[in-house]
Design a protein with these regions (language model features):
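A feature for loop-to-transmembrane-helix boundaries and adjacent hydrophobic helices
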Residues: 1-244
Length: 244
């Protein structure tokens, strides 16, 4: 664990923030390159991703703060301390989708086509971001002396759920890229992403120790994952039956 990478004068470079920036840079570069291949202005893609990145972080933070409101009411200034971690993917997804629709509507572009273009690279960005979680020590797993690693901030040997999540997201990225290079209907890549992400998150949640049980032995994110799985499955079935 390395929550702090280094200090430059009075400024501290935090691993979590650094990984978020790296995730944005790498995903934007690769998405822009893919846009050129599809004869789409890469500047539009970069601007879209920047807008989605900012809105996604805000949405993810708001969702996380609401989920842990009692803790943040005790120390409100922690709400803006992103260097300590604390982003909820589901809030980021909701905000990111809304931001994408608004931006693409303004630009009068095909919404599903562009989302299909960028979504594999957002999965890659998530994979990189989870490395930041590992270095920061957030999103941690349950105690496991046999299969865990030592987290100094928790003074315990825990399951490295961040690492598992990062690797699974990398696999999702590879699958989506393979599908992207084959003929597909608009929206299909996006729904496949959700279909793959949902069981991934459900599994990881079963190993995590930082999210409370809310209903019948399941965490809130497991319940949301089940809902997203069936919504994405319905979306894929609809696209399969839809005439070109």
């Amino acid at each position: 664990m390395h929550p702090e990478i280094c200090k430059i004068g009075p400024f501290t470079v935090y691993s979590y923030g650094l990984m978020l920036v790296l995730a944005f840079v790498v995903s934007s570069f690769l998405a822009a390159r893919q846009a050129r291949k599809e004869n789409i202005n890469p500047e539009i893609i970069f601007n879209l991703l920047f807008f989605v990145f900012i809105c996604g972080i805000i949405g993810a933070r708001i969702f996380y703060v609401i989920q842990n409101l009692k803790d943040y009411l005790k120390d409100p200034k922690e709400i803006i301390m992103l260097q300590h971690g604390g982003l909820a993917w589901f809030g980021g997804l909701f905000a990111g989708v809304i931001a994408s629709v608004i931006y693409l509507k303004i630009k009068k572009l095909h919404i599903l086509k562009i989302i299909d273009l960028v979504i594999p690279f957002l999965a890659l960005a998530q994979s990189i971001g989870r490395i930041g979680c590992l270095l920061n020590g957030c999103c941690f797993g349950k105690p496991s002396p046999e299969h865990g690693i030592y987290f100094a901030v928790h003074d315990a040997v825990l399951i490295p759920t961040q690492m598992y999540s990062s690797l699974l997201l990398l696999v999702i990225f590879i699958i989506l890229r393979l599908l992207q290079d084959k003929p597909h209907k608009e929206g299909q890549i996006f729904f496949v992403y959700l279909l793959l992400y949902a069981p991934k998150r459900f599994f990881i949640e079963s190993l995590r120790a930082d999210n409370p049980i809310v209903f019948s032995g399941f965490t809130l994110f497991q319940i949301l994952s089940v809902a997203i799985f069936f919504v994405s499955l319905a979306g894929l079935i609809y696209l399969a039956r839809k005439k070109k």
